[in-house]
Protein backbone atom coordinates (compact mmCIF):
# COMPACT_ATOMS: atom_id res chain seq x y z
CA UNK A 1 0.00 0.00 0.00
CA UNK A 2 2.02 2.94 -1.30
CA UNK A 3 -0.14 5.55 0.46
CA UNK A 4 0.49 3.96 3.86
CA UNK A 5 4.19 3.42 3.20
CA UNK A 6 4.77 6.96 1.93
CA UNK A 7 2.90 8.44 4.91
CA UNK A 8 5.09 6.39 7.28
CA UNK A 9 8.42 7.42 5.75
CA UNK A 10 7.35 11.03 5.11
CA UNK A 11 5.12 11.84 8.08
CA UNK A 12 6.55 9.58 10.78
CA UNK A 13 10.27 9.33 9.91
CA UNK A 14 10.43 12.80 8.32
CA UNK A 15 12.01 11.90 4.96
CA UNK A 16 11.29 14.45 2.22
CA UNK A 17 9.49 13.45 -0.97
CA UNK A 18 7.63 15.12 -3.81
CA UNK A 19 5.43 12.02 -4.28
CA UNK A 20 1.90 12.77 -5.48
CA UNK A 21 0.67 9.22 -5.99
CA UNK A 22 1.49 6.26 -8.18
CA UNK A 23 3.63 3.16 -7.87
CA UNK A 24 7.00 4.84 -7.21
CA UNK A 25 8.21 7.28 -4.55
CA UNK A 26 11.67 8.81 -4.15
CA UNK A 27 12.84 10.29 -0.86
CA UNK A 28 15.60 12.84 -0.38
CA UNK A 29 18.36 12.09 2.09
CA UNK A 30 20.73 14.39 3.95
CA UNK A 31 23.71 12.38 2.68
CA UNK A 32 23.58 13.80 -0.83
CA UNK A 33 23.51 11.51 -3.84
CA UNK A 34 22.12 8.51 -1.96
CA UNK A 35 18.45 7.96 -2.77
CA UNK A 36 15.79 5.98 -0.96
CA UNK A 37 13.01 4.63 -3.15
CA UNK A 38 9.74 2.82 -2.59
CA UNK A 39 8.23 0.87 -5.45
CA UNK A 40 4.88 -0.90 -5.35
CA UNK A 41 5.49 -4.60 -4.66
CA UNK A 42 2.55 -5.47 -6.90
CA UNK A 43 4.28 -3.70 -9.81
CA UNK A 44 7.81 -4.81 -8.88
CA UNK A 45 7.04 -8.55 -9.03
CA UNK A 46 5.86 -8.14 -12.63
CA UNK A 47 9.48 -7.47 -13.64
CA UNK A 48 10.33 -10.98 -12.40
CA UNK A 49 7.17 -12.65 -13.67
CA UNK A 50 6.34 -13.65 -10.09
CA UNK A 51 3.07 -13.76 -8.17
CA UNK A 52 2.50 -11.01 -5.60
CA UNK A 53 2.44 -12.36 -2.03
CA UNK A 54 1.51 -9.81 0.67
CA UNK A 55 4.08 -9.54 3.48
CA UNK A 56 3.30 -10.87 6.95
CA UNK A 57 5.04 -10.05 10.21
CA UNK A 58 8.62 -8.77 10.44
CA UNK A 59 10.79 -8.98 7.33
CA UNK A 60 13.91 -10.75 8.61
CA UNK A 61 15.89 -10.55 5.36
CA UNK A 62 16.21 -6.77 4.99
CA UNK A 63 16.99 -3.77 7.16
CA UNK A 64 17.23 -0.07 6.50
CA UNK A 65 19.66 1.74 8.81
CA UNK A 66 19.25 5.44 9.63
CA UNK A 67 22.21 6.92 11.52
CA UNK A 68 21.91 9.94 13.76
CA UNK A 69 24.70 12.24 15.01
CA UNK A 70 24.74 11.14 18.69
CA UNK A 71 23.35 8.72 21.25
CA UNK A 72 21.19 11.58 22.58
CA UNK A 73 19.61 11.94 19.14
CA UNK A 74 18.84 8.20 19.14
CA UNK A 75 17.10 8.49 22.51
CA UNK A 76 15.15 11.58 21.42
CA UNK A 77 13.97 9.86 18.22
CA UNK A 78 12.92 6.79 20.20
CA UNK A 79 10.85 8.98 22.55
CA UNK A 80 9.29 10.85 19.61
CA UNK A 81 8.28 7.62 17.85
CA UNK A 82 7.03 6.15 21.14
CA UNK A 83 4.73 9.17 21.58
CA UNK A 84 3.40 8.51 18.07
CA UNK A 85 2.38 5.02 19.17
CA UNK A 86 4.91 2.96 17.23
CA UNK A 87 6.08 -0.39 18.55
CA UNK A 88 9.67 -1.55 18.77
CA UNK A 89 10.38 -5.22 17.92
CA UNK A 90 13.64 -5.32 19.92
CA UNK A 91 12.59 -2.95 22.72
CA UNK A 92 14.22 0.24 23.99
CA UNK A 93 17.53 1.67 22.71
CA UNK A 94 20.57 -0.33 23.77
CA UNK A 95 24.29 0.49 23.74
CA UNK A 96 26.52 -2.38 22.61
CA UNK A 97 30.08 -3.01 23.78
CA UNK A 98 31.33 -2.26 20.26
CA UNK A 99 30.02 1.33 20.47
CA UNK A 100 26.68 1.42 18.68
CA UNK A 101 23.49 2.63 20.36
CA UNK A 102 20.34 1.69 18.48
CA UNK A 103 16.74 0.52 18.40
CA UNK A 104 14.50 -0.98 15.75
CA UNK A 105 11.08 -0.02 14.43
CA UNK A 106 9.10 -1.71 11.66
CA UNK A 107 7.36 0.07 8.81
CA UNK A 108 3.74 -0.81 7.92
CA UNK A 109 4.89 -3.74 5.75
CA UNK A 110 7.18 -5.20 8.44
CA UNK A 111 10.53 -3.97 7.09
CA UNK A 112 12.98 -3.35 9.93
CA UNK A 113 14.49 0.09 10.37
CA UNK A 114 17.52 0.39 12.62
CA UNK A 115 17.93 3.86 14.11
CA UNK A 116 21.30 4.33 15.74
CA UNK A 117 24.53 6.20 16.27
CA UNK A 118 28.19 5.41 16.83
CA UNK A 119 28.89 8.74 18.54
CA UNK A 120 28.48 8.95 22.31
CA UNK A 121 29.13 12.71 22.52
Model features per residue range: what roles?
Residues 1-6, 63-66, 118-121:
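N-terminal beta-strand motif that seeds the catalytic metal site of vicinal oxygen chelate
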Residues 27-30, 49-121:
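Vicinal oxygen chelate
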Residues 13-14, 23-25, 62, 89, ...:
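Residue-level marker for the onset of beta-strands and adjacent loop->beta junctions
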Residues 1-45:
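Core segments of cupin and vicinal oxygen chelate
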Residues 44-51, 91:
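A short, acidic/glycine-rich surface segment
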Amino acid sequence: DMDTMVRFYRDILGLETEWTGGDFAEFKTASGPVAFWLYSRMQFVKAFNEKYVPPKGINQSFELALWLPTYANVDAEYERLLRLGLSFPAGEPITYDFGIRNFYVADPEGNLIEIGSMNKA
